[in-house]
């Protein structure tokens, strides 16, 4: 199967889109092709950013799908001193916990490259109160980017996954986190367990957002997300539409064949 591109323009936006935007969807033959395309696109965005500025900022997703991408990135000959890594969400567990997104990225990628420790910006999960931890990371982002409220930091690249229920980061269906509009970081919840997560407005300030999704189980949610009449509160990934940036959806054939 050759890659297929679909363009969703301002003439056929989801209900949540209020500004003209083009969304690019590419369906790859299998998971290996998906990771290869993801790697090529991430490297392109890093290179382009470094051609225009002194450093690049990347926010990572968790889950199993991006792990091969992170492993592939670990062998790339990049100037890691110019790359700053953040996380788009994190389970509220210790950094060495098997479920930690930070741990997964470190083992697959960051511990295997000569990146300065100061360039790694994990979400804090050591405070007894997740709300205080969310505020700490919010403060860190604003201080590091030099941005005061009500403005939001602008990431060069945000990587996102999508769950079978249409959630992304830790923005779950029918939850209060979806409506937070004045903060960079909020507390999401899954099965009663707190998580830290980027907010919708922070994600939508990014210069580039790349969704990576695989598997037949994603099809029903993708149908609703790409529908002109889907419910964004039930399928939170619909809320992601960078106001002045690029949005890519990279899918394997199992997930995206019905969109070809």
Which residue stretches match the model-derived regions?
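N-terminal glycine-/serine-/threonine-rich phosphate-binding loop
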Residues: 5, 13, 17-58, 131
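Glycine-rich N-terminal segment of FAD-binding domains in flavoprotein oxidoreductases
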Residues: 50-75
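Glycine-rich beta-strand-to-loop/alpha-helix junction loops that act as flexible
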Residues: 60-65, 160-164, 214
């Amino acid at each position: 199967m050759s890659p297929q591109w679909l363009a969703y323009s301002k003439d056929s936006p989801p209900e949540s889109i209020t500004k003209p935007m083009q969304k690019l969807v590419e369906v790859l033959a299998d998971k290996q092709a998906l990771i290869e395309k993801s790697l090529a696109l991430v490297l392109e965005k890093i290179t382009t950013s470094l051609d225009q500025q002194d450093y690049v900022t990347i926010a990572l997703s968790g889950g199993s799908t991006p792990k091969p991408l992170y492993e592939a990135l670990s062998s790339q000959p990049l100037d890691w001193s110019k790359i700053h890594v953040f996380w788009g969400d994190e389970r509220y567990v210790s950094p060495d916990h098997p479920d930690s997104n930070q741990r997964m990225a470190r083992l697959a990628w960051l511990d295997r490259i000569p990146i300065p420790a100061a360039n790694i910006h994990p979400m804090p999960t050591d405070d007894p109160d997740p709300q205080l931890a969310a505020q700490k990371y919010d403060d860190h982002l604003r201080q590091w980017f030099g941005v005061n409220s009500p403005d939001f930091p602008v990431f060069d690249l945000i990587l996102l996954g999508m769950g079978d229920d249409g959630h992304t980061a830790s923005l779950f269906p029918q939850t209060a986190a979806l409506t937070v509009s004045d903060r960079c970081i909020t507390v999401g919840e899954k099965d009663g367990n707190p998580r830290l997560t980027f907010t919708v407005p922070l994600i939508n300030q990014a210069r580039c957002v790349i969704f990576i999704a695989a598997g037949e189980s994603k099809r029903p949610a993708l149908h609703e997300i790409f529908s002109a009449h889907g419910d964004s509160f039930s399928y939170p990934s619909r809320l992601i539409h960078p106001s002045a940036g690029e949005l890519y959806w990279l899918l394997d054939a199992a997930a995206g064949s019905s969109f070809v």
